[in-house]
């Protein structure tokens, strides 16, 4: 794990990981995933991990924002995050709801996206979205065509419409068959 309190690590993330390996190669947008995991037994360059826990996502968003803004193409580059704390809105203006299950369960599946979106909106994020079709899939938890279509319908009315193939793409329905492609194309036009 890279230490976001270590200036040398921050420089490496900005200059090598983000600018050189992504932006210099033409990447125009990316998911600045994670940013929330700071083990309480970490040894940091500066600060106590227990006290830094909530600040960690803000540091992650700030590093990404500074790297993008200092790049020659920075005004044309877009990134979004999933983790945050008070003040993260200054650095990350677009948030996604994280990794939902590929099902209709209220607490972890598609239905939980709506209250999560409102919650993030009330927290200062005007642009919030979710993975179309969900992400988490394990054992008997497999995405159905019905779920994929319903989620696509829902996200057609969100600020950002983005699909995800899940962690087990080989067993989950994907938007590749002719009928689903037509539905997705139609809803993409609604979104646009």
Predicted regions and their residues:
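Catalytic-domain carbohydrate-binding cleft regions of carbohydrate-active enzymes
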Residues: 1-192
């Amino acid at each position: 794990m890279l230490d976001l309190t270590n200036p040398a690590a921050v420089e490496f993330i900005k200059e090598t990981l983000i600018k050189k390996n992504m932006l210099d190669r033409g990447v125009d947008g990316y998911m600045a995933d994670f940013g929330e995991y700071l083990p309480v037994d970490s040894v940091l360059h500066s600060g106590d991990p227990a006290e830094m826990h909530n600040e960690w996502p803000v540091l992650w968003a700030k590093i990404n924002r500074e790297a993008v803004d200092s790049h020659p193409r920075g005004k044309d580059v877009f990134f979004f995050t999933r983790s945050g704390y008070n003040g993260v809105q200054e650095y990350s203006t677009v948030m996604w709801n994280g990794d939902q299950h590929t099902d209709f369960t209220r607490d972890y599946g598609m239905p939980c996206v709506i209250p999560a979106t409102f919650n993030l909106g009330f927290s200062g994020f005007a642009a919030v979205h979710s993975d179309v079709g969900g992400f988490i899939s394990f054992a008997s938890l497999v995405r159905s065509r019905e779920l994929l279509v319903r989620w696509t319908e829902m996200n057609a009315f969100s600020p950002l419409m983005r699909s995800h193939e899940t962690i087990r793409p080989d067993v989950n329905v994907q938007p590749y068959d002719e009928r689903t492609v037509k539905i997705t194309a139609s809803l993409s036009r609604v979104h646009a």
